[in-house]
Amino acid sequence: MSSMEGKKVPQVTFRTRQGDKWVDVTTSELFDNKTVIVFSLPGAFTPTCSSSHLPRYNELAPVFKKYGVDDILVVSVNDTFVMNAWKEDEKSENISFIPDGNGEFTEGMGMLVGKEDLGFGKRSWRYSMLVKNGVVEKMFIEPNEPGDPFKVSDADTMLKYLAPQHQVQESISIFTKPGCPFCAKAKQLLHDKGLSFEEIILGHDATIVSVRAVSGRTTVPQVFIGGKHIGGSDDLEKYFA
């Protein structure tokens, strides 16, 4: 597998299903006059793809856009129904799911490999690339090792290439409940600092049992930053002081 850096992406047409209609999408539509990140993987719903590869690109999408990226595409040798179901399951609204059902794009990239040992048939090798106006500027291709290596095609590696000066924000989670004024205060503090966070809403995403299990407390909000328990809204205020 060799790099396609400096070359144009293959010209193919992807057969997609949007609602109840078939819609053909060409590589020209996806790449012309745009800066696009593509990451490709062996298959929808597979463990590494679903737990690490896809979620991190979705999480960092606002950061990538800040640095001039127009779109982020995930390409897999799967049909459009599988890719649509995977998108719905993952709730990755910042990513465009591209079904390379016949493997034409992947083969044109030189990344089509045999996964017959897993019963997969022909699939994509794992890689990522930055494409500007249809020309590949940079590729990160996983090493040719047994199994499914995941070392260089991740979102953080791409971000370091695109914006080496960027300081990656620590992950933030906050337990809240509807109508809680202290929760609203804590969320506003985070917004004022320009920090993104994941909100876990009691009664919808979890119960007070989870709050007690991870924080030892029975009140909300409870804020966690970078694996550290900060506490409630007053604690968060002190943390930022």
From Swiss-Prot:
Q: Where is the signal peptide?
A: none
Record field: pH dependence: Optimum pH is 7.8.
Per the database record, which ranges form the Thioredoxin domain?
3-167
In the record, biological process GO terms are: cell redox homeostasis; cellular response to oxidative stress; hydrogen peroxide catabolic process
Assigned keywords, A-Z: Antioxidant, Disulfide bond, Oxidoreductase, Peroxidase, Redox-active center
Further notes on this entry? The active site is a conserved redox-active cysteine residue, the peroxidatic cysteine (C(P)), which makes the nucleophilic attack on the peroxide substrate. The peroxide oxidizes the C(P)-SH to cysteine sulfenic acid (C(P)-SOH), which then reacts with another cysteine residue, the resolving cysteine (C(R)), to form a disulfide bridge. The disulfide is subsequently reduced by an appropriate electron donor to complete the catalytic cycle.
Q: What is this protein identified as?
A: Hybrid peroxiredoxin hyPrx5
Species in which this protein is naturally found:
Haemophilus influenzae (strain ATCC 51907 / DSM 11121 / KW20 / Rd)
Q: Which gene specifies this protein's sequence?
A: PGdx
